[in-house]
Amino acid sequence: MAEGDYNAVREAIADILDNDDYDDGSIGPVLVRLAWHASGTYDKATGTGGSNGATMRYMKEAKDEANNGLENARQFLEPIKAKFPWITYADLWTLAGVVAIEEMDGPKVPWKPGRQDYVDETNVPPNGRLPDGAQGQDHLRDIFYRMGFNDQEIVALCGAHNMGRCHMDRSGFEGAWVPNPIRFANTYFKLLMNEEWKLTTLKNGVKQYFNEDEELMMLPADYSLMQDPEFHKWVEIYAADKEKFFEDFSKVFAKLIELGVRRGPDGKAKTNFIDRNNNDPNPRL
């Protein structure tokens, strides 16, 4: 394959999404989660964290409790990396999330290459920078404002919960947010608005919300979107207008995966801490 043929990489990613042995028959949602968590460590005040560097290759970040289960996503992408050794892990992880969203009937998300892979743990961000689903609106604002997002963007990014499910042995929570967790839509917002949600304590002591028939769940952080007037306004808008949600989600997810990437006037990412030795992407934990 020609070096720099990102369309070929896109096609290869799309080809591995269907997987009968994984949740709901698709690895798409966990690839979106990988792109999200690889980017969501950014701190605008210090310029640290973000998608550049692929720092989840290193034990310190890989072992952050918020990243439990993402070793699966990283391993799923190893055959792609082997087939296209010229692509950095930082680019591969973010591109995989973008492709997964599109393949699950979501919006097209702008994506640019150029991220680099850091050579060691020096620039691994501190643990604890990712959202905690057990918390409420104040926590969401603390986390997302740190990255540079506003209230509308917070709600739009929460819409990623249209995909995937929680696992008690990973996050402590259990279940899916929507009936079809491998199709991107605005169902998450409709359900927040229209279902009756009851706070329940799981057998592990973790609290989450269930709908009346206990088929679907919401995290306390999800439900806080209904309790905060500014957040609630955007939940209402996105529940009523799928096209508006798709438009806003595309923009904000593109912004998310660019966090930590320093680009020059030509749009190319500035080279920094390149891993020229192709270090082990999955350090022994």
Swiss-Prot record:
Record localization: Mitochondrion matrix; Mitochondrion intermembrane space
Residue positions binding heme b: H161
Site positions per UniProt: Transition state stabilizer: R33
Record-annotated membrane-spanning stretches: none
InterPro entries: Ccp1-like, Haem_peroxidase, Haem_peroxidase_sf, Peroxidase_I, Peroxidases_AS
Keywords, in A-Z order: Heme, Iron, Metal-binding, Mitochondrion, Oxidoreductase, Peroxidase, Transit peptide
Cofactor: heme b
Record CDD domains: ascorbate_peroxidase
Annotated active site: H37, W177
Major localization listed first in the record, in broad terms: mitochondrion
GO molecular function, one term: heme binding
One of the GO biological process terms: cellular response to oxidative stress
Gene3D superfamilies assigned: 1.10.520.10, Peroxidase, domain 2
Subunit record text: Forms a one-to-one complex with cytochrome c.
PANTHER family for this protein: L-ASCORBATE PEROXIDASE 3, THYLAKOID LUMENAL 29 KDA PROTEIN, CHLOROPLASTIC-RELATED
Family: Belongs to the peroxidase family. Cytochrome c peroxidase subfamily.
Protein name stated in the entry: Putative cytochrome c peroxidase, mitochondrial
Organism annotation: Yarrowia lipolytica (strain CLIB 122 / E 150) (Yeast)
UniProt lineage: Eukaryota, Fungi, Dikarya, Ascomycota, Saccharomycotina
